[in-house]
Amino acid sequence: PVKDRVEDLLKRMTLEEKVGQMNQFVGVEHIKANSAVMTEEELKNNTANAFYPGFTEKDIEKWTEEGLIGSFLHVLTIEEANYLQSLAMKSRLQIPIIFGIDAIHGNANAPDNTVYPTNINLACSFDTLMAYKIARQTAKEMRAMNMHWTFNPNVEVARDARWGRVGETYGEDPYLVTLLGVQSVKGYQGDLNGNEDVLACIKHFVGGSEPINGTNGSPTDLSERTLREVFFPPFEAGVKAGAMSLMTAHNELNGIPCHS
């Protein structure tokens, strides 16, 4: 049973291996593609393009073999996923890699996958069944690519039209956002027992959609009433629907960073 396997692994893992399971890197092909077009200064200083200063793809391959990486994102081909998984199987405890991706409106980052309308367009339909069906089909296509985890649905409530991520949301109404978010979670995850199910991730907790200057990641200043009436309900419903993960926000809320 999975529970017994997990408990056994936790007893046998070193502290370094446990920390390693919390490490997530982009795929080696993504690093190669970005580093090929970056200047020397960018290579040394920049992380925005998924390059890790001081490290190369060889380092990441080595850490994977040592069981010090738990998950990858931006792995866009079956071949690369299989390669990285084969490295993980050489590790001491052979803990499999989890592959995650921003499958926001279909698995659109990967080639030859179905691209659906964005979440804001889906919200215009008020069609909860369609939200479920899109998530279900996206999950099937993800698993066909050896992907296990989508960073969706975005259940932030759109509050500022200047904010650049409005298109990822289900709009400005907390009730509608909640309904569509819950159906998306159910569609992605199914019963989590089959080879057509993926992990959902409700995001971003919390308040990032009302930044003080309209810029993504900027500070937010929100009352407790606004948080409880507007921002919390979609997340609470997502958790109750069984969402297997939650992404914290990139902003600070009332002077306190949502994550560090």
Predicted regions and their residues:
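Glycoside hydrolase catalytic-domain context in secreted enzymes
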Residues: 1-260
